[in-house]
């Protein structure tokens, strides 16, 4: 049991596992924010613009009794599609920004040593040649 706990401790303390855990927590919170944005802000305004429609009430009745109809709730589906598109766009922007930063780091020219270091290196080389 102790070996199992030690192995788990090593696993959880590695960077990848911690990064994944942080990503999952932040992703879950971000998903809730986007869902609220779509349900509470975006779709009501969009519904108002297209004629006072509430997306939550958009249903297609396909059968059943009038008291208990069988419905396809395509308004809720549209809200989920809006959620997905907004989250996918946000992730795209994040990945694009990270890739741009990585490219800038890769493209940066090698830095030259300061003039003092160059001078000291030359002096060292001269002294080495004279001592031989």
From Swiss-Prot:
It is found in: Cell inner membrane. GO terms for molecular function: mechanosensitive monoatomic ion channel activity. Disulfide bonds: none annotated. It holds the Pfam family MscL. The chain crosses the membrane at residues 11-31, 75-95. GO terms for cellular component: plasma membrane. Homopentamer. Channel that opens in response to stretch forces in the membrane lipid bilayer. May participate in the regulation of osmotic pressure changes within the cell. This is Large-conductance mechanosensitive channel. It comes from Synechococcus sp. (strain JA-3-3Ab) (Cyanobacteria bacterium Yellowstone A-Prime). The gene is mscL.
